Amino acid sequence: MDAIHPVSLRNSKRHPLLHSERNLSRRAVSPSISRSFFQHSNGSFPLFQNHRKSLPSAIYKSVDPYVDANPLDPLAAAKASFADFPEQDDSQSSTSPLSSKYHTKKNKQIFVEDSRRGGAASNAAAIAAKKSGYYERTSTRKRSLTVPTPRTSFPHHPRSRRFSLKNAAIATSYHKFKPLSSNSLSSSGMHFSASKQAFNSPLLQTFSPSPSVSPFSNPAVEKLKTSASKQAAEAQSLREFDFFTPTPEPSDKNLEKLKNGASKQASESQSLKNMESLSLARSSPILTSEKLKNGASKQAIESPPFRASEPLPSSNIIPNPAMERLKNGASKLAIESQPFKSAEPLSSAIPLPNPMSEKMRNGASKQAIMAQSSKINPLPPLTASISDPSFEKLKNTASKQAIESQSLMNSGPELLEPSISDPMLEKMKTDAGKQTVESLSLKSSDATIPKPSVSDLGVEKLKNDASKCAVESQSLMINDPSVSSTSFYNPNMEKLKNGAIKQAIEHQALNAAILNKTQLPYFHQSSSELPISASKRAALSQQTESASKSSSNISEMCDSHPPSNFSISASQQASKDRFSEATSSIDLDLSPGRSLSLASSKLSVKEAGARVYNRSVATPVMTPSNPFEISKSASQLASIAQVPVSEPAKTSEVNLKKSLSLASSKLSFQEAGTSLKEKTANVQHSPEVLNDRSLASLSASRHADAISSKSKQHTEIAQPAFNTTGTVLMKTKSNLSDSALSTPQHSDSVLFDITSKAARLASTCAKTDLHRKPRRKHKSFTLENYFGHNAEDESPQSDEVESQTPPSGYSENDIGGTDIYPFALQGAALAAAKDFSRREASLSDSQSAASMDMLPMKKKLSHSSASSTRSIKSLLTNANQKHIHSSINETDDIPTMAAHIVATGQKNKEKAPSFSNDQALDHLLGSAHKRIPSNKTEWSSSSLHIPSHNSFSDIHHRKIAAHAAAITAASEKLTPSIEETSYSSSKAHDASLSAATLVANKDKLIHAPTPQVLAPVLPKVSLPHRHSVSLGQIRGESEVEGDVFYDAPSDKEDLGSSNAPLDVPHGANRSSMDEVNGSKYDYSDGILDGSGQYTDSDMSDDENSLKDSQSSVLSFSAVPTKVLKFKLRDVLGSEYSPSPQLLASSSDVSGSSSAVRAAMKADKIFPAVHENPPPLKTKQSIAKPSPHTLRVPQKKHKHFYHRDDGKYKSGTNLRKSETVDLPQFFIDENRRKLYEGLWAANKGYLLSKSEYSKPNDLICNIVVRELWSRSGAPTSVLAKIYDLVDRHHTGVLGRDEFIVGMFLIDQYLKGRKLPLKVPDSVWLSSKRMGDMLWRLEKLQKKTDNKKPFFKKKKKKRKHLKKFFDFNTTAKVNEGAMTD
């Protein structure tokens, strides 16, 4: 039970203490009080602990509850009830009044005698409270106060007397001060913690030993939720319960949040005067005014602090230049008329404060810091000057003119010390005000006195002008000579938002450097560019000698910083260029803490990018412990390539250390890619420099990829970096020396890691939405432009930079409009087989190869698609041609290995094979190439360098590499959860694939017959007999732009289960038995032995015919062959070979996934060997019934009748109904209501009014997908239905569109085909009056098609009439002749 208070339950809501009135019982008073009432703030009231000891002995003896207790006097009753408390020891005083001590029978006898007197006192206090008017009654339901009776379970509970005291105290206070008025406790809804303090404070003050001191004289009251109500409660409690000491008048009546800047300024200036000024000001009370609504009262409150202060001399009056627009004109004039005491300059012995100790949030404090910095750090023979650099636009012309006139009056010829220099006045709307301010600056500036003036290039518009004036006045008062020992401290400092304020702080540091001669001495520039006064330039030039002497000390200070601090920002570098050093002997490379930053504007970024090269060459830096500890951002590593290498041994180390960062902007990335491309041409580099350059290009491509994925407009930034990446990686391998590769520090594993990362980043960029949108056809796109070489050129390209250049008609602004596939994806698959495609063109006739390059794009693709059908035998016959391998170099091994690493599942680390990358590469190369090293050395995991060898595997290796990258991209896109088999490192398995075995069988492999070259390596693969929808059809239908069904979970069902071999029959589980010896691997329906031979136990005759074809691309992957074969059969199989027009101009390819595009691109441009699919089994014809057992079905007799045109027509055809099937092209009323109910229950969900005008009439596409997917239809079918009904293409469906879509799903589930276009009758029947409208339309069509029968009868009658007329004339003629 919650707290019970002697207030009628009817009016309990008006009492602020009773927050739990919903749990009150019907009894008005109860002697037991719940635990939550006393322990609301994790502790009981201090009033009820050791209460007997806390009372003075005189008070305790003088109170007699039986004589002095007046039932009509609640105060006396309270004292009597309080005096009857039994004395408790410290051990018995519990923090919880409801302790278990009161519940024991042993302690019940202690309070037998005291409970009688306590009950009488409690009743007396309750009756007194009732008669004093504390209780209120209502007319509807009268509730009287009953005499409290103790509980039966606690008959002698002493808490009833405690409660009587509290009730009496409340009753007394409410009787005298009208507690239920608007200004009382109930009007503000005071929290329970405030009420607890109100009841604790009076008693504590009443019985305190020093009654003259008030505990509420402290002006700094903590921020409460409702400050005014709590202060009122405290003041009221002080007046009521002070029985012995007269309470002084409270100094703070009603504290609120001051919303007016003028009153805040007055209170702040007064508080500062009281704390830090003279004793007269300290003795004055602190005035904290309430919320002012009238300007007159505001003026009256603000005037006392100025009247209390001593009169200031007229020579020290400084105007306040920026006052806010005040709401009340009278108060504004009163505030403006108050003078502020000026600050005399402090001595130079005061230490320099740190103005950036906190983040500045208020712009006013910025100006105060600038004003103070000029006074704190003056030159010894000079005096400081206060500069107000920019007046903001004053909205009120009258107040502006008043301020300007006041400043003109104060700035006379005798006030030369606080001269005001304003170099950049803001443009003012009022011309009169502008002229006045300009005249003020001209009058105040005196060129005869050489004094440094702090210049501000542009201060932002300060939001709170009143607070700015307050801080300015505060800073001026602090700098008073009487309080010169006080250092400046601004508690409201925040983050600087404007670079101009940073520059002002830099000028302050300049003054300190001139004075102390130990600060940053490297600022100098020409007089035309340096934005400081001439006097300061003269002073700066005088200190150059002392600055040069301190350069050695500065260099020693830099050695203490970690290497990570060398990543200096572009703005810092720009600031060094802007304020360069005085002499060339001064070191540039100071720590970031010592460098002063300018604003991160576009101009400074551009200057930093342009000058970082010149600065980085001439500046030495310290040597870090690890060069790779420096953050390898794109701009940092791109700056490495900008430095020309004259001494590779020394400069390459400096390049890594000297990584001054370029800004991450469009210009910097573009310059980084361009400069990297220029610097890598025609330069001989050392291995270390090339490694750094490859890292630089890789990092540049990574960050360019991140930018290009965010916005379409940044694509032109990423393109140069990607082009340079492929160029540097190709040239790195060729330029490295054999001696460098022999060392473990410069091994190929670093390059392999680089290329694998480049391939992964390239494929990631290709999968973004930027590259999925349809491209426009580009006429100038040819293979010659794409590959950058001529097909008939067999020699390698020159040393010039080879890059994947875009077509000639390509423009950076129109990247999305060309018919160019993503360059990143091309770099992953095409660069791996680029050299092979050039060599393979020479296999055919040179004339056909030369003519093929001159053909347009479509014909080239058709030629390559025709060449893709060549078998393995045709390739093996041409393998002995020597001119094919004459120009093969080692530059192609790096992208090839990268493609292989990607193909082994490097991207999905959690599902990758258990062996490492080097082992996987060794295994892959050993199984794919069968290439014999020329130096007869075994391959190892540490050195994976593959020497060239003139064998067929060189060409076949590059072809497989291109397809391996495309296959892996497709497998990751289609089957992300493919279970890859982790081959254990078994001796038998590794021995069969190791280089030692290949070296031993060198002669056998070279002189073996042609069909057996790849026999021991390639496994025998069986193709499952499953006929599914081709992947291209599925993706072509579902992956259109704006498709909400892309990558739906139901796509896995269309492709089959990915956790088991897909040709295993249903119910058969896959059991992979990896034996310890590694001899065989059991896949439940086939066996894969250690040598790679795969034997299918249930192979049919058609599958046995595939044994001769042993050149499967999928056999080189660590994934089980049967899984990948089925997954990628539709992508790479010959049964789905898209036409050249599809690759050239169709939007299906560009709209499909990047994996399908990569596979088809590699398939068409780089021909690969594919297996012929098994012949499809013909359908068995249904056996005819035996003539001996069943009767032959008799045909119905057709009735013919004679027509007018001489032909016969069957009566059966006439009796057939010519009406269409009603349910197929019409939505009946019952189904329409069912669909409409589903639409009404989900409309408007996930839609906002800001995007759509009527969201309640629409249904979101995500909701549509969730609803339609419950039907169980394939995702491709649902996507097609969505395209049929989506007429507006806004991502939402209306009522009619949703109903028609539901109708089409039902028709598909019934087995009907989907229409190419939704008939008009279906759209018409989807409306609420559709049934009636459809029937009317049907009736209209029926009447229109009805033949005019009466015309036929008329014609027939005419024919009969002519016939009868002819007969009658003939008979007449015969009769005449007979006569």
From Swiss-Prot:
Pfam family, one: EH
GO cellular component: cell division site; cell tip; cytoplasm; cytosol; mitotic spindle; mitotic spindle pole body; nucleus; phagophore assembly site
Biased composition annotated in UniProt, kind: Basic residues: 770-780
Similarity section: Belongs to the IRS4 family.
Regions of compositional bias (Acidic residues) in chain numbering: 793-802
Signal peptide: none
Biased amino acid composition, Low complexity: 541-555
Annotated EH domain residues: 1240-1329
Compositionally biased intervals (Polar residues): 262-287, 562-573
Keyword Lipid metabolism: yes
Official protein name in the record: Increased rDNA silencing protein 4 homolog
PROSITE patterns tied to this protein: EF_HAND_2, EH
Domain EF-hand span(s) in chain numbering: 1273-1308
Keyword Lipid metabolism included in the entry's annotation: yes
GO molecular function: calcium ion binding
Assigned keywords, A-Z: Lipid metabolism
Stretches for region Disordered: 1-25, 138-159, 240-314, 337-370, 534-573, 768-816, 1047-1110, 1168-1208
GO biological process: autophagy; lipid metabolic process
Native source species: Schizosaccharomyces pombe (strain 972 / ATCC 24843) (Fission yeast)
